[in-house]
Amino acid sequence: IDHPFDQAFEQVVALVKERGWEVIAVSPQEGRIEATDTTLIMGFKDDVVIRVQGVGSRTRIDVRSVSRVGKSDLGVNAKRIRLFLAELKDSRE
């Protein structure tokens, strides 16, 4: 994204909190945010890790979401990532 690291990191942390995810760890030094999202239907806990890396005057954001239980997540984790990145993009505009 076209924002410096500090600004992007703050936006990511704010969006994680806005989405109601449980924040487990925030480390600006490592550029890492760890959180847990609980599914609405069954109450399953899914782990989310977001890496924020400064690249010159821009920032790269990587998101990983994984279910703790079950063999298939029925696309929930991919959808969570897509929605998060779309909301992050909208919050910057």
Regions found by a protein language model. Name each.
Residues 1-93:
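Ser/Thr-rich, low-complexity intrinsically disordered terminal regions
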